[in-house]
């Protein structure tokens, strides 16, 4: 009898060990890269196994994937059309209303509350950055090769898109023997034309959510863009004198930064402040574990005040350690940060509308959609977005 008791005890032990191993095998899948702070999270949660995944889908196909897939528990996303569409359409899960979550939401500036908080609930957390000068945020400023620019005798930088596009066209027509390209401008989907479209929206969208694309400045910019597109050489290997949206805070070094061009003389163009966030898939099968992951990311932030970009003195910008800036760099950062805007609730830069509008612009650049028809369709879509915003 004793023998059977030992066998039973051994079997029970093995069964319990098996159950423990099953409990430890809960897999949490993050659509995004590994993070530096996950080592501590994994040590604190041995019952969880973190899997990281990536997707090659883009545009509308990517948005559809995130709206329908149950394979991911947490999304790693830039604040932009995809994130805002998921938030507005209810495909993200709010974090629980704990005192800690409310305190964190209250600590955010308005620009960040606009994208992370909805109806009083916290829906996302900035992704901690190990090295960034401004944690979680990168400024969409432009860089230029000042020495080469002066070497080519180019004078003042173009202050408007019209000046820039005219110079781009002239360069392609007359400077093919130069060792430099004028600008790094990808005209495909998501490239330079999309950046110019987004800049127009950021600059001209009104407070009540309306915008008009049938303006002389937009017509001229699109006409020049199409002219340039007809001579654009995508495989040009020469060094570019201007790199749009290439000067991020993490790459400061000795770069000389310039603000993006405006659409009209005398204007100051807004600078996009790009924010990466974690958000929980509303279809997750592990909501508690996913929330634990996002809350751990919040704890990994150096301090919430580092998210305050537009009012922070440059000398205080740091990431775990004090960053020493030269006086010239500090003044430049301060000037740029005053222009910075986080892409928030623009109806024109969200979801289906944005990707359809971008596709229309590509059709125009490829000669399959006349300019008048492009502007008509853009205004039609803008009106649809405004109507949805009122509902």
Language-model features: locations:
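Glycine-centered hinge/linker elements that transmit conformational signals in sensory
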Residues: 168, 192-194, 204-234
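Bilobed periplasmic-binding protein/Venus flytrap-like ligand-binding cleft at the lobe interface
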Residues: 143, 275-314
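Short helices/loops that flank or line small-molecule/ion binding pockets
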Residues: 59-71, 75, 89, 166-170, ...
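Long, aromatic- and glycine/proline-rich binding clefts that accommodate carbohydrate-like moieties
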Residues: 306-363, 388-391
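Extracytoplasmic/periplasmic substrate-binding proteins
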Residues: 84, 196, 219-289
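Short, solvent-exposed loop/beta-turn-alpha elements that line the ligand-binding surface or hinge
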Residues: 96-108, 181, 187, 202-221, ...
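Hinge/lid segment of periplasmic solute-binding proteins
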Residues: 81-139, 259-260
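Conserved N-terminal structural module of periplasmic/extracytoplasmic solute-binding proteins
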Residues: 1-10, 17-84, 89, 372-391
